[in-house]
């Protein structure tokens, strides 16, 4: 049994680190509510700030998720790494692996301009209106994580377990 104080602690932490989220916030709920991670950060936290939660009514395939993100334009995205990796692979990876782009990403000054453009494309792919993508529930691909770090993509990888309601870090 998860104690109330553990749930409350997670909610207080989320309010502290994401003060910009409020009753105007939109969230697409794509994780199973039967799991603590989805229940906490796509439902309970949002209820305490009065946010608008948009539940997917179909199995969350990449196509359905992308349609929902484009339509809702969420202010925060809560996901497992696999979802984020699939979006990266379908929207960005082909661009980054082109020979000319690979070469230009090694040229000082030009690399920053290209990284900024790529980051903008990735942000647009996720609806273009979010403050952060928060991932947890599984390991995040190290190569993609390094790439996200390099382009200054706004993301956080959390660690937790259900017994901790669910976040630890």
Could you say what each language-model-derived stretch is?
Residues 38-44, 56, 143, 147, ...:
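Generic hydrophobic alpha-helical membrane-span motif
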Residues 26-30, 132-134:
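Extended hydrophobic secondary-structure segments that form protein cores and membrane-embedded regions
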Residues 82, 136-144, 157-169:
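Conserved A3 ("GATE") glycine/threonine-rich loop of ANL adenylate-forming enzymes
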Residues 1:
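Conserved adenylation A10 loop of the ANL superfamily
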Residues 8-26, 33-121, 154:
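Conserved AMP-binding/adenylation subdomain of ANL enzymes
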Residues 24, 50, 130, 150, ...:
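Active-site lining segments that contact anionic ligands and/or coordinate catalytic metals
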Residues 105-153:
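Short gly/Ser/Thr-rich phosphate-binding loop of adenylate-forming enzymes
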């Amino acid at each position: 049994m998860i104690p109330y104080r553990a749930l409350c602690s997670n909610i207080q932490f989320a309010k502290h680190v994401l003060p910009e989220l409020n009753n105007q916030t939109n969230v697409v709920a794509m994780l199973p509510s039967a799991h603590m991670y989805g229940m906490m950060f796509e439902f309970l936290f949002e209820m305490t700030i009065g946010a608008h939660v948009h539940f997917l009514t179909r199995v969350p395939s990449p196509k359905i998720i992308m349609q929902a993100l484009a339509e809702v334009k969420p202010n925060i995205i809560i996901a497992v790494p696999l979802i984020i990796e699939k979006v990266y692979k379908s929207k960005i990876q082909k661009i980054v692996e082109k020979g000319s782009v690979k070469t230009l990403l090694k040229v000082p000054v030009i690399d920053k301009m290209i990284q900024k453009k790529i980051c903008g494309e990735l942000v647009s792919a996720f609806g273009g209106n979010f403050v952060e993508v928060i991932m947890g529930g599984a390991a995040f691909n190290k190569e993609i994580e390094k790439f996200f770090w390099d382009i200054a993509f706004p993301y956080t990888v959390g660690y937790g377990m259900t017994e901790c309601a669910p976040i630890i870090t």
